[in-house]
Amino acid sequence: MIGLADCNNFYCSCERVFRPDLTGKPVVVLSNNDGCVIARSEEAKALGYKMGDPFYQVKEKLEAEGVAIFSSNYTLYGSLSNRVMSMLSHYSPRIDQYSIDESFFEADESMAKVFFREHTEDHPTLFNKMTIDELSEKPDSLLHRYGSKISADVLRAVGIPISVGIAETKTLAKIGSKFAKKYKGFQGCCLIDTDERRHKALSLFPVEDVWGIGRQIARKLDYMGIRTAAQFADKKESWVRSHFNITTLRTWKELNGESCISIEELPQKKSICTSRSFANEGITDKNVIEEAVANFAVRCTEKLRRQGSVCQGITVFAWTSRFNGHVPEYTIHDSLTLPIATNAQEEIVGAALSILRAKYPKPMADSRPDCPDMSFHFKKAGVILWQISPDHPRQQDLFDPIDRSKQKKLMEAIDAINRKYGYGTIRQAIQGTDCRFDLKRKYMSKQFTTNIHDILKVKTQ
């Protein structure tokens, strides 16, 4: 069996961990530069706020209704996500982190039985006096209580509410987690372990919300009169093959209980991107743009090394706003291919900067009546790494001038120091020190778990 642990309204839940006064109150989290709503608590959803609502349009309404507003605090969210994943690793030897707030894990009766036996020896009344033998006679009770305990323990230890789905496939487990999140009667865990439960769950689940069903496929299914996951799952395999691609066929098989995505099958990213929109009127200083691109390239290489990969292709882009008619428009978008695949940040940063400098516009000397400011105001920039392959084995070059072994040790040392003492402890000079391209985050909460200056102060009197 496969389980999925899904954090409920994750960003909002993170903001509530150190603000218990917000429990039961509406909360929203804003995107980069406080642009739009990207996360809502259940109370905020009940007030009618939608994902993607432009902040400037709903700001007055949010304030009038007493909604707590937060800028996105990704450092805090990442730290709490790591705590949740660490907790999950205590319950299952194999976990697959799917996103910052979701993780698949292996779940079976024998594992749950061993777990309960170990814990009931220390806490004999922990499970309402139901013995292990009695639980073993009711496998559904065993697995359900196993999932419910995971949900309860993560909430108690980390402060993040999670919903658990347990089923035979990853797709069914995701559906189970949705039911566990929506209906409190499941006690944090929805178990789909029989055909009867599977069909009942699918009959209540909209087909457009199924993992793996995109918008175009959903529209096509709707045109065919298929509105629920059960209607789709009940179709014959030959019909699915004749109308859809192999990816949709895999989803159909998963809905019918045939596992097509194993617990260890995490597809390696085909590309890695780090980008950012800049606040206010954008950036006009070439040095600041270079600093930003260097930082984005470093972030990409960190992700690359974390997944044990190297890359050969690099793309850099930057553009001005299309909506500001008072300044000139300009777009940078170019790529290059390295001779040897690498994950060393000095190589990738150097390549990214060479692209930017080669394409950066020359200053415009003469102004126009409709455009008095002739400087280029860049509103967004980013770096994309592609042609990604595993670090081992790596194609070598007999005439490579770089000592790859020495370079790898250097990267490992930098990563270790930055993990221990915080991001940016060791950095390249081109990255700067004062982050002159930082986001607009007026409603930013503190970094309670990673910044010693933001640690909560407890009054003892």
List where the protein language model places each region:
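A generic structural signal for short beta-strands and their flanking turns/coil linkers
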Residues: 23-25, 160, 312, 330-334, ...
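Short intrinsically disordered coil segments
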Residues: 120-125, 331-334, 397-403
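Core structural elements
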Residues: 103, 310-324, 381-393
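Short acidic/His/Gly/Ser-rich catalytic and metal-binding motifs that mark active-site loops
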Residues: 114, 173, 324-327, 391-393
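DNA-contacting surface of Y-family translesion DNA polymerases
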Residues: 209, 217-375
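Short Gly/Ser/Thr- and Asp/Glu-enriched loop/turn motifs at secondary-structure junctions
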Residues: 98-102, 167-170, 309-313, 376-380
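Acidic, metal-coordinating catalytic segment for phosphate/diphosphate chemistry
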Residues: 337-461
